[in-house]
Design a protein with these regions (language model features):
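Short, structured loop/turn "capping" segments at alpha-beta junctions
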Residues: 158-161
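Active-site catalytic microenvironments for nucleophilic, acid-base chemistry
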Residues: 114-118, 154, 182
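Conserved small/polar residues in nucleotide/adenosyl-binding loops
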Residues: 178-185
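Conserved catalytic palm subdomain of right-hand nucleotidyl-transferase polymerases, strongest
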Residues: 119-135
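Active-site glycine-rich loop that binds ribose-phosphate moieties when present
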Residues: 107-110, 130-134, 138-154, 165-166, ...
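Acidic active-site catalytic centers that drive phospho-/nucleotidyl reactions
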Residues: 69, 104, 127, 131, ...
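Metal-dependent C-N hydrolase catalytic cores
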Residues: 1-121, 164
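Glycine/proline-rich, flexible active-site/cofactor-binding loop segments
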Residues: 85, 169-177
């Protein structure tokens, strides 16, 4: 992918932008997701221009670019989320559809703050965990296990348009599990 900055002369031609968010201050047990954007970029050097099974050449169908990394502050969660949100607002204002690679799950909240600022969005979420906890470790509201609870509370996610696939694992005492008898409920 070509690498472009937001001030590039050709930025308005970009339809899909790859954005790294090298941040993992919201994780409680396994640091390292901040290395995800670099690792994904390193591994993607082997991606071929055409899908062998479908013969589709996605990079000829749309204009993709690597827009670099969102600015982060590893020392301050609130400031970091503000910086990420402001960066994504610029992406949104240019009409670019972001594809985010990055840090821990809390990264989703500032991205949603930018993308859903005008109206709530739906989400298809593939994960082993819901990330809907009220808090972690006696009251911490901004962790890798809480971003979608915060997003719903802030009116960013419409819970009637959220689908979570692959949920498994144990739960903490006192957690509520909400289920629906029908996918339409």
């Amino acid at each position: 992918l070509p690498h472009l900055g937001l001030d590039s002369a050709t930025i308005n031609d970009v339809e899909f932008g790859l954005i790294g968010v090298p941040w993992d201050a919201g994780t409680t047990n396994r640091s390292g997701p901040r290395h995800g954007p670099r690792q994904m970029r390193d591994l993607s050097t082997m991606i071929r221009a055409m899908n062998g099974a479908t013969r589709i050449k996605p990079f000829e169908m749309a204009n993709f670019a690597d827009l670099g990394d969102a600015p982060v502050n590893p020392a301050d969660i609130q400031d970091c989320m503000y910086r990420i949100t402001e960066f994504y607002k610029k992406i949104k204002s240019k009409g670019i559809i972001p594809m985010t690679i990055g840090g821990d799950h809390l990264t989703s909240l500032p991205v949603l703050r930018a993308l859903a600022a005008d109206e709530p969005v739906g989400m298809i979420h593939f994960d082993a965990h819901t990330d809907l906890f009220e808090s972690y470790f006696d009251g911490f509201k901004y962790t890798h296990g809480t971003p979608f609870r915060r997003a719903i509370e802030e009116g960013l996610l419409d819970p009637k348009r959220v689908i979570q696939i692959g949920i498994r694992g144990t739960m903490y005492d006192g957690c509520l599990l909400y289920t629906s008898p029908s996918p339409r409920d």
